[in-house]
Amino acid sequence: MANKILVETSARHVHVTAETLEILFGKGHTLTNKKDLSQPGQFACEEKVTVKGPKGALKASILGPTRPADQVELSLTDARTIGVVAPVRESGDIAGSGACILEGPCGSVEVKEGVIAAKRHIHMTPADAAELGVSDKEIVNVKLDTARPLIFGDVVVRVSDKFALAMHIDTDESNAACAFGEVYGSIVK
């Protein structure tokens, strides 16, 4: 591996509960897997929703499987565009976060909290963490090897035997670093 980490751009997306899915798409609806993602068991869905704020709306894909709570992950540019608050948080840390409306073909849901801008993070297995000399929840810096090399600070390491090695950044961060196509980064101390 030699400290080479695949960097993936995570575009705006939504995680929904089974209850929200049925309100948006109809009773008994299940998510349709369009494409498996790099993290085992995660997938992009055929289903899309409209994310509405006081200043506008954006289309976003749903990622599966369903979750215990609704979560909307936007870039800060997306959040400003539609007029919603999106604090920078780790996935799942939604208490007191932003609000929006989700609209689907069969109904809408008010998300009272759940809008975030995802904190930069690296998924890795315990073996990856041992090889890279890092631990779960550690904060690291990562240099991207692109046409506009950039060192991202405040990157949280997430370790689980259910993960595959990959760093996730949002579209704002990706654009700043020209992180297009297959991009790799390395942890710098």
Regions found by a protein language model. Give the residues of each.
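Acidic, glycine-rich active-site loops and adjacent beta-strand->loop/helix elements
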Residues: T146
